Amino acid sequence: MTPPAPAARRPSAALLWVLLAAMGAGPLFNYGVSASSTVVMDRLDVTSGQLGTVMTVVFAAAAVTSLGLGRAADRLSARAQLSIIFGGTAAALVLGAVAPSLPVLYAAAAVAGVTQAISNPTTNRIIRTVVPPERRIGWVGVKQSGVQAAQLVGGLFFPAASLALGWTGAALGAAVLIGALWVLALVAAPPLPGAPPPATGPVGGRRRRDTSPLPATVWFFAAIAFLTGLGMQATNTYLPLFAVETLGMTLVAGGAAAAVSGVVGVLSRIGWSRRMSSGDRPTTLLAVICLGAVAGVAVFLAADLLDLPALLWVGAAVHGLTVLGANVVINAGLLSEVPAERLGRATGANSMGMYAGFALGPLLMGLLRDVTGDYRAGFAVVAAGYLLALGVVLLLRRHVGRRGVDA
């Protein structure tokens, strides 16, 4: 069992910043490719649909490795896991920077996916181990906002840097930043030990692996993460291209719209975590998020159908306010449902669902864009995913109601 932190030791603010950076490191690759989309497409001579497959590779790699890395998060030291996150992201950015073809960019994307697969198990385990119970949900909200902080940095830095320095220069610059954060993480984070070995069996001291089933609630959360993740990442990936190709805006403006979504997402994730801390039920918050996300899709479609580019900014803000907060509520729900020694495995299962949605969303959006010539069908699929997620939320509410649990 993962030992609790000594009562006398309180986690430092530096550790919170390390967790935020750990959540944002891997996604910086994703947002860099998305925000530099037209530059990358010209460099590699690919279509927008083909560019979307890069994100599919990222999240397919994350989905495939999530369960195994979730188990690893229950055993490895925190510093070892932080090295996987920051070192792997830096390697992915360097490889992507020099990629001469789409297959090489796929290889970089796979590395980035692995680093992202362990980020939630790592940060959840650290919070459960060293943070007092009354502060955990607040910490989850802050560390989850690291993803949107990466969206903000990527949306502002990559378009301007790629236009000035090319994709190679922009990606290498980001790799230097991640390398510096890696060093700071190892210095600032306290030396957290790895979890003790699994219990041994009666014969020969062999390790006994925990194969007990996870609570059904974990799988409900994983399904919600899959459906909201599908729409979230489809929108994140194609928002800059939607701005350029459909609304006639510049790449810098498209990146700025993604940055707006990221800024609002940072604030919304902290806000949703505060609602959880104040006692709101996860299912109530998730239902509001799903309905709000559908409204955001409607705004994007209105911007297209009415030819009103100004609505892009409204849609980006609604996107950040709603669906970008889903993972905070889901992760906070997991913290309350799963004991510390199994939290890595539970988070890995949830991450598998989320990253499967992340992989499928950009793929569908890109394919539908190439087939139909616009983004309307893709956004319709995104809205359908949010409505299905709402249905799963209602099923979860019914399930926990039968158990007498306030969730």
Question: Language-model segments: what does each one mean?
Answer:
Residues 64-100:
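Conserved MFS/SLC helix-loop-helix module at the cytosolic interface between two early adjacent transmembrane helices
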Residues 33-34, 217-259, 266:
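Extracytoplasmic gate region of multi-pass secondary transporters
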Residues 337-372:
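A late C-terminal transmembrane helix in Major Facilitator Superfamily
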Residues 142-190:
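Helix-loop-helix hairpin linking two adjacent transmembrane segments in secondary transporters
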Residues 282-330:
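C-terminal transmembrane helical hairpin of 12-TM major facilitator-type secondary transporters
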